[in-house]
Design a protein with these regions (language model features):
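Amphipathic alpha-helical packing segments from all-alpha helical-bundle domains
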Residues: 11, 15, 35-45, 55-81
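Helical hydrophobic small-molecule/effector-binding pocket
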Residues: 8-53, 99
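C-terminal peripheral helix-coil segments that are non-catalytic and often amphipathic
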Residues: 12-27, 70, 74-81, 96-133
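Helix-turn-helix
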Residues: 1
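Membrane-interface starts of transmembrane alpha-helices
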Residues: 91-95
Length: 133
């Protein structure tokens, strides 16, 4: 079921990321990398290759990004209207903070051990604590 609050949505989003990570590891394998790279690294490498060689992919990627930003904005707007978060919250900038926290951490950690989902959840909870009414 869809989340009723921003706090619930954050939990669902992190759970979705964890499930996706598990699928990536199942597809790529874990600890079998000849180059000591995390599965996340191969995922970003694959996306880079797709971006370079797949015709028309830019528009598809833009659409996927837009859908994710729209989803965050919708949930944040609802949280603002319900009084869950502060009334002076900038919905668009807040959506950007959550989304780019996820992408930035994912990219940075892809070059190390792969995305630490617990750290992502902790960072999301911190952003949420700054918004809480």
């Amino acid at each position: 079921p869809p989340a009723d609050t921003l706090a619930e949505f954050i939990g669902q989003y992190v759970a979705g990321v964890a499930a996706s990570m598990k699928r990536i590891v199942e597809l790529i394998g874990d600890n079998s990398s000849p180059h000591d790279c995390s599965p996340n690294f191969y995922y970003f490498h694959f996306l880079s290759q797709v971006r370079m060689y797949y015709p028309g992919i830019r528009q598809k990627i833009e659409k996927i990004y837009r859908q994710d930003y729209d989803l965050w904005e919708k949930v944040i707007q609802k949280a603002k209207e319900s009084g869950e978060i502060r009334s002076d919250t900038d919905v668009k900038k807040t959506a950007i903070m959550f989304r780019q926290m996820f992408l930035g951490l994912s990219y940075e950690q892809a070059f190390l051990n792969g995305l630490n989902v617990d750290e992502l959840a902790e960072n999301f909870r911190h952003i949420y604590s700054l918004l809480k009414a």
